[in-house]
Regions:
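A domain-level signal for the mature, folded cores of soluble proteins
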Residues: 24-113, 138-294
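Predominantly extracellular/luminal cell-surface or secreted proteins
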Residues: 118-122
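Short, surface-exposed loop/turn motifs with a glycine/proline- and acidic-biased composition
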Residues: 312-333
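C-terminal tail/sorting-segment detector
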Residues: 4, 326-342
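Residue-level detector of functionally pivotal "anchor" positions at catalytic/ligand-binding pockets or at interdomain
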Residues: 292-318
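Acidic, glycine-anchored loop motifs typical of Ca2+
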Residues: 123-132, 148
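Bacterial Sec-dependent N-terminal signal peptides
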Residues: 1-26, 298-299
Length: 342
């Protein structure tokens, strides 16, 4: 006899959200699981953090980023536009009234290298970051009106072992200059074509508090909402609320959860002997793991009329195949079970 799929999934959800949610949470980690994409812009730490080795491609570099960020290391995103995309082993819930994500860099007072956070919900359920990105709007939207450049675009041109030329869509051009402290190639070594990035450009935040002959650059922190903008020990400054999400037109977007996170360097700035301003990232975590799992577990039920032998997310989206994390499987007898893919 075929069981009612809605009743079955509801029972499963209740089990997850009540008696067994704490045990279930032990199967998951609050820390990021893996890096999906690593595309830095040119910079003095590129090809070093992480280290490029001959033959590495984009996938190999992403794997090195995963290794670094899950073992206490650091990843540099280079200049404006350079980004990293990563995921957790579960969806992160947008908990009302709370910040949801902690993302750390290597910032400190006077050395803010702000990166913008973008988030994505896996709406098509395929486990890939190929749905719609939303920016988490930070304080510059209100504190620097008229100074933020939206839809800013920059193109870098390879110039092996030399300064890296760039042009932007504002009619400007310049160079990512080499310095004496880093002797490796500054352009990502696994790429041999122009690199173009588009995003929100924040105002320059560097002030020379020294002299022309003895410069001392102070990089002022923004009020909130950016990675590598403050010390990692300042958990409030390094925390982000999914409720800050906006679409491409800067309109607020309501997201119940997210599955992918992207951080990109949001300034195009050179600071003399210090070099370019480049966002770094050292880790990320879900600030409320149990609540994320519980919220996901009580999402909407699966359609009664679905075919057998199907795979679903807990929110009821049909999947073409199992993905990492929790999958709901209905077999040919109409029975439902959970399968966790690590």
């Amino acid at each position: 006899m075929t069981k009612n799929i809605k009743n079955t999934i509801t029972v499963l959800c209740i089990a997850l959200s009540c008696n067994h949610i704490d045990t279930f949470a032990q199967e998951y980690s609050k820390y990021l699981q893996a890096v999906d994409e690593y595309q830095p812009a040119p910079g003095q730490f590129v090809n070093e953090l992480p280290e490029y080795e001959l033959g590495d491609d984009a996938a190999a570099m992403a794997a090195k980023c995963t290794e670094s960020l899950t073992t206490g290391g650091i990843v540099s995103l280079g200049g404006f536009g350079g980004y990293i995309t990563f995921h957790f082993d579960h969806s992160i819930s947008n908990v009302p009234g709370k910040r949801d994500l902690y993302i750390s860099g290597n910032g400190y007072n006077g050395n803010s290298e702000p990166g913008i956070v973008m988030v994505m919900r896996d709406d098509n359920g395929n486990g890939l970051p190929d749905d719609t990105w939303y920016e988490l709007a930070g304080s510059a939207d209100t504190d620097s009106i008229g100074k933020v450049i939206y839809n800013y675009s920059i193109t870098y041109t390879p110039n092996p072992m030399g300064n890296i030329p760039w042009t932007d869509n504002q009619g400007n051009s310049g160079e990512m200059k080499r310095n004496g402290y880093h002797q490796q190639e500054y352009f990502p070594a696994w790429i041999d074509t122009n690199l173009t990035f588009t995003g929100t450009r924040l105002p320059n935040n560097a002030t020379n508090k020294g002299t022309d002959t003895q410069p001392y650059y102070f990089l002022t922190s923004l009020r909130y909402g950016y990675v590598d903008n403050a010390s990692r020990t300042d958990t409030t400054a390094c925390s982000f609320d999914i409720s800050w999400a906006v679409d491409a037109e800067r309109r607020p977007v309501t997201l119940d959860r997210i599955d992918f996170v992207r951080v990109y360097c949001a300034v195009n700035q050179q600071c003399g002997w210090i070099g370019e301003t480049s966002t770094e990232i050292t880790g990320a975590e879900d600030l409320h793991l149990t609540e994320s799992l519980q919220s996901t577990a009580i999402s909407s039920p699966i359609d009664d009329n679905a075919d057998h032998n199907d795979i679903y997310s807990l929110s009821g989206h049909r999947r073409p195949a199992m993905v990492r994390g929790l999958n709901i499987i209905r077999n040919d007898r109409g029975e439902v079970r959970k399968v966790v893919v690590r």
